[in-house]
């Protein structure tokens, strides 16, 4: 083991802790901003559609991506039903269920970190770096994350649209 590997092993827990603390604050009560909801919907839809376009000829991996997306959509619908929506004099606010959102985001983060470690471990060797779409666990994590957060974003955008229609 060289010094770079040791540094990587020591810094990884700090990175994970920092990501977790950022997610915890992101899952607290937030002001509802319509443009962010639409941006979230587009980003998370692209997060699923871009790998799907790569996997059109590999139906097995496309199936894993679809399974992850379906699970993410299901969890997203359940989570949106448990999201606290508030219309106050100061503005519109929402509070998503923190535990599920943090768990899904940390699962995705763990998968990305694993890919990074794999690339680091294989550098300088003759082992080819696998493509992002070669792992069924990665496709499950991408689908789950994109489906979940895309559904939450779509639900929030629809909520704000209904409020706007009710106001006139």
Annotate each language-model stretch with its function.
Residues 1-5, 51-63, 132:
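Helix-coil boundary and interhelical linker segments in multi-pass alpha-helical membrane proteins
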Residues 57-83, 95-96:
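Alpha-helical transmembrane-segment detector that highlights a single hydrophobic TM helix
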Residues 73-89, 101-118:
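C-terminal halves and exits of single transmembrane alpha-helices
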Residues 103-168:
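C-terminal membrane-adjacent module
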């Amino acid at each position: 083991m060289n010094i770079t590997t040791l540094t990587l092993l020591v810094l990884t827990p700090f990175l994970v802790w920092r990501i977790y603390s950022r997610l915890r604050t992101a899952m607290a009560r937030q002001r509802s901003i319509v443009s962010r909801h639409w941006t979230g919907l587009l980003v998370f839809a692209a997060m699923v559609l871009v790998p799907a376009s790569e996997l059109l000829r590999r139906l097995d991996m496309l199936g894993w991506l679809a399974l992850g997306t379906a699970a993410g959509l299901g969890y997203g619908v359940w989570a949106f039903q448990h999201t606290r929506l508030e219309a106050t004099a100061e503005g519109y606010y929402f509070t998503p269920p923190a535990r599920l959102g943090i768990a899904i985001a940390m699962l995705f983060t763990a998968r990305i970190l694993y890919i990074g470690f794999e690339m680091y471990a294989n550098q300088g060797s003759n082992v080819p770096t696998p493509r992002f779409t070669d792992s069924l666990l990665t496709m499950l994590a991408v689908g789950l994350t994109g489906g979940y957060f895309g559904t939450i974003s779509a639900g929030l955008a629809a909520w704000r649209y209904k409020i706007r229609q009710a106001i006139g």
